[in-house]
Amino acid sequence: MASSVDEEALHQLYLWVDNIPLSRPKRNLSRDFSDGVLVAEVIKFYFPKMVEMHNYVPANSLQQKLSNWGHLNRKVLKRLNFSVPDDVMRKIAQCAPGVVELVLIPLRQRLEERQRRRKQGAGSLQELAPQDGSGYMDVGVSQKARGEGVPDPQGGGQLSWDRPPAPRPPAYNRALQGDPSFVLQIAEKEQELLASQETVQVLQMKVRRLEHLLQLKNVRIEDLSRRLQQAERKQR
């Protein structure tokens, strides 16, 4: 979530977020990041002077969430040459599943790229120690490494297994680079796919119900036919 980010990319994203100290327990990515506060904390973790946390108010209301995201877009993301379109911000604020991931993945790449440029010649980044407690990897996310090359969350290079990385379609690469139009298209296509899957499931249930009713009718017809034959024999 290519029309969605694949499992390995999500796996790496959750590992990355789990290694960043955040002010809230980590339960559900779409809800946790919906008001923009944790996104500001992630950026502040990399660049403390870039973010003033008092500008971001934890919120449940859509209006305040959009206000937080708007301020983050204008004052912080702009300095990273990064932007989240208004319609994508609204989807994130509404906790639409699978949308915030499409922002966090390219944002992570932008943060690590900028940090590498600032630390050129200073050696590799210091390894982040995993936090105690639960994280996104502990709340039902079970992924399998596919043997593909994935971005190294510490050095920005490639982690490789036995097999070389599979080639990515151009649309997938453009989405991971933060192309706003592709971010929105991917989010919309994912929602359409989920809706289609739900429709198929409902139709399958209806088919099974009709098959069951047909079986009951056949049994009833056989029973009535048998009784009719018995009555005819008695009359003779």
UniProtKB/Swiss-Prot annotation:
Tissue/organ expression: Expressed in the intestinal epithelial cells (at protein level).
Gene: SPEF1
Primary site of residence: cytoplasm
Annotated segments matching region Disordered: 115-176
Protein name: Sperm flagellar protein 1
TM region(s), chain numbering: none
Subcellular localization(s) per the UniProt record: Cytoplasm; Cell projection, Cilium, Flagellum; Cytoplasm, Cytoskeleton, Cilium axoneme; Apical cell membrane
Region Essential for homodimerization and microtubule bundling activity: start-end pairs: 183-236
Source organism of the structure: Homo sapiens
Gene3D superfamilies given in the database record: Calponin-like domain
Gene Ontology cellular-component annotations: 9+2 motile cilium; apical plasma membrane; axonemal central apparatus; axoneme; basolateral plasma membrane; ciliary tip; cytoplasm; filopodium
